[in-house]
Amino acid sequence: MGKQVGNVQLMQKMNRLKVLNLVRRNQDIARPAIAEQTGLSLSSITNITTYLLEEGLLEECGTEQAERVGRKSTLLRFRTEAYGLIIASLNENHAEVSYTDLEGKIQACDTVEIVGLSAERVITRLEEHITTLLDKFGKENTLAIGVIFSSLVLDGSRFVLSSSMKWKNVDIKKSLEADTGLPVYVENISRSKAIWYSSTNDRDEKNMLFVDLENGIGAVQVYRGAINRSLLGEIGHTTVEKDGEPCFCGNKGCLEAMCSAKRVIRLYEEQTGTEGTDIAKIAQRYEQGDPAARYAVSDCATYLGIGLANLIMMSHPAVLVLNESDFAQCPMLITDAVEECKRRAYPALTKELRICRVMVGREETLRGAAVELCDRLFDLGSAYNPVQ
């Protein structure tokens, strides 16, 4: 008898999560549409949505704009302010610790300077600022903490290495969970950006590649609307030059070692014997025909083109999205890299390939991170799921 009751409760929870996650992804949706898309009866949908409304996870938001005769259905929406999230976004210079709602809308943000600090000291600073935010907004109202940065993350949240942070095997998850008592999820920031982009653009594309050129080079595949987690995406640590520049990972000739804004500047300064320039000035001199600028940009662009061609040959995307970021002030490097890519990849794979160049900002990245956190939290296997 107990087993039968348990099975009923499990099925009830599964259906509640199915409805909640459908509404999360389809704001302003009516109960009949939910029933149609989930395959559940309308009476079941009524019971489930009543529970979710009482728990504060859904809210009613007017009636549908339908031309049909008869009573219009009430629309439902995911209530993003039901709980809060803390998201820490790190780079080599600073960390931004934000308190957001469930869709990543910022309610408070602290910037922490971390230049020159050890990993242990950075974690301590994060703990201090997270504690301040929890005191302000309430730990009981906060579902989880997300930590996002350019990094190799395995098994969902196990951090391994970050070339940009110069960290290896730092257990940031364990440290923050022990200090806060909240679940902590560590994620590669490129994935957060890709999640935001795919949820707001090209949602119907079956196969999209998102390549992030900020603080290294990472790739994310979105296949049939979902992140392909079997593709690790560490294109930045694939070898493109046998005896190339040394990389923090311990290898030589990694793509992100051979193509970075820092390397463009270094190549230019080696050619000219100057110091103190920046990539924007090099781009300007490239346009003026400066041989040193053209050499520095073209050399790095060639390696990026090789990396992109390798990706295309392996995954055959319909859309290639390039987050320019570090090279936004040197757009000709991206242009040259795309041309190199097309020269090296099979023409049949690039003939109909659509290439988009974008700039994913801070707020968009946080929204992507929030989507990822909610996907993990509102999951049947999550021990921190608020749905019963």
Mark where each language-model region is.
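Extreme N-terminal segment that seeds HTH/winged-HTH DNA-binding domains in transcriptional regulators
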Residues: M1-R31, E36
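Glycine-rich phosphate-binding/hydrolytic loop that grips phosphoryl groups
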Residues: V8, K13, N21-R24, Y185-T200, ...
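Conserved phosphate-binding catalytic cores of ATP/NTP-utilizing and phosphoryl-transfer enzymes
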Residues: E60-L85, V184-M208
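Gly/Thr-rich phosphate-binding beta-strand-loop-beta motif of the actin/hexokinase/Hsp70
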Residues: G70-A108, L209-Y223
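Glycine-rich phosphate-binding loop and adjoining helix at the ATP-binding site
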Residues: I106-N207, P331-R343
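Glycine/GP-enriched mid-protein hinge/lid loop-to-helix segment characteristic of carbohydrate kinases
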Residues: C109-T111, S118, T180-Q284
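A mobile "lid/hinge" subdomain adjacent to the ATP/sugar-phosphate binding pocket shared
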Residues: L255-V321
